[in-house]
Amino acid sequence: MPLPLQPMPEPLIKPLADAAPGENPVHVAANLQTFLALDFGLKRTGFAVGNRLLRTAQPQGTIAAEGDARFVKIALQLKEWQPDALVVGVPFHPDGAAHENTLRARRFARQLQGRFKLPVFEVDERYTTTEALGRGARDADAMAACIILEQFLRSI
């Protein structure tokens, strides 16, 4: 059943697609140094870790779970990596329009923030899976999360 389209509250971060070229769309506090990025999918969620100082990210794997089981597995990754903040890829149509998965990813971002009490930043993830496959990724979801995090790190 399609999700009803409702006005969204102010996003946790202005998606990069809304920023002018060269514009820093958000202020990220200097104490936020390590990040865990998530490429949300209905059945699989890729994740990557990175740090601000080196502006590098590394794919780490994919969580194949839904609902509460997904959050249990994310909690394990948070315990292992201890990031200062999370970055969530939010999909849009090529023209920048939102669709059902945009709403799902934003809901996922809000759930992460509510459950784990960490800052959560949204990043436009258009074409990240295509780029991941183009890089020859064996785990396209984890590589897409890595690309999302690389984009975020370049923007701050």
Swiss-Prot record:
Keyword Nuclease included in the entry's annotation: yes
Source organism, top-level taxon: Bacteria
Compartment annotation: Cytoplasm
SMART domains given in the database record: YqgFc (SM00732)
GO biological process terms on file: rRNA 5'-end processing
GO molecular function (one): nuclease activity
GO cellular component: cytosol
InterPro entries, sorted: RNaseH-like_sf, YqgF, YqgF/RNaseH-like_dom, YqgF/RNaseH-like_dom_sf
EC number assigned by the record: 3.1.-.-
Disulfide bonding pattern of the chain: none
Pfam assignment, any one: RuvX
Key words of the record: Cytoplasm, Hydrolase, Nuclease, Ribosome biogenesis
EC top class, as a word: hydrolase
Family named by the database record: Belongs to the YqgF nuclease family.
Its job: Could be a nuclease involved in processing of the 5'-end of pre-16S rRNA.
Protein name: Putative pre-16S rRNA nuclease
Source organism (scientific name): Albidiferax ferrireducens (strain ATCC BAA-621 / DSM 15236 / T118)
